[in-house]
Amino acid sequence: MATINQLVRKPRVRQVTKSNVPALQACPQRRGVCTRVYTTTPKKPNSALRKVARVRLTNGFEVTSYIGGEGHNLQEHSVILIRGGRVKDLPGVRYHTVRGALDCSGVSDRRQGRSKYGAKRPKS
C-alpha cells in the first residue's frame, strides 16, 4: 500500500483499455459508403461464403463490415450504417451492417428476430 506522500508525488495511473471497434470513435454507429461488396470464406472448422463489404466511413476509416441475414441489395456506392460486433470466424471483420437502415434493405420474409434484420411485422 502506497503512503499518501508517495501518491502525492506520483499518482496512480489509470489503465487504458483498447477499443475493439476503433473506427466508431466512441459512437454507437457510423455511416459509410461501400467500396467493394464480396464474399469470403471463414476460418478452419467452418465452411461457407460469408457476405462482407469494404466500407469507407465518414471519418475517413476504411473497414470491413459483415452483412447478416439471407440475401441483400448492397452494391458499390451503397450508403450503409455500421455498428460494432465482430464475426468470430472471419479474421479482420469487426463491424456489422445495420439492416433496414439507409440503403440496406431489411431481410424479406423474416418472422423471428425481426428487429435484428430490419424486417417489418407481417400482416398476421
Curated annotation (Swiss-Prot):
Q: Which UniProt keywords apply?
A: Methylation, Ribonucleoprotein, Ribosomal protein, RNA-binding, rRNA-binding, tRNA-binding
Q: Which InterPro entries match?
A: NA-bd_OB-fold, Ribosomal_uS12, Ribosomal_uS12_bac
Subunit (UniProt): Part of the 30S ribosomal subunit. Contacts proteins S8 and S17. May interact with IF1 in the 30S initiation complex.
Looking up CDD domains in the UniProt record yields: Ribosomal_S12
Q: What does this protein do?
A: With S4 and S5 plays an important role in translational accuracy. Interacts with and stabilizes bases of the 16S rRNA that are involved in tRNA selection in the A site and with the mRNA backbone. Located at the interface of the 30S and 50S subunits, it traverses the body of the 30S subunit contacting proteins on the other side and probably holding the rRNA structure together. The combined cluster of proteins S8, S12 and S17 appears to hold together the shoulder and platform of the 30S subunit.
Any single GO molecular-function term of the entry would be: structural constituent of ribosome
Q: Which residues carry this modification: 3-methylthioaspartic acid?
A: D89
Pfam families given for it?
Ribosom_S12_S23
The disulfides recorded in the entry are none
Question: Which residue intervals are annotated with compositional bias (Basic residues) in the record?
Answer: 113-124
Domain of life (superkingdom): Bacteria
The segment annotated Disordered runs over 105-124
Annotated family: Belongs to the universal ribosomal protein uS12 family.
Full protein name: Small ribosomal subunit protein uS12
The keyword Ribonucleoprotein appears for this protein: yes
GO CC terms in record: small ribosomal subunit
> What does the entry give for GO biological process?
translation
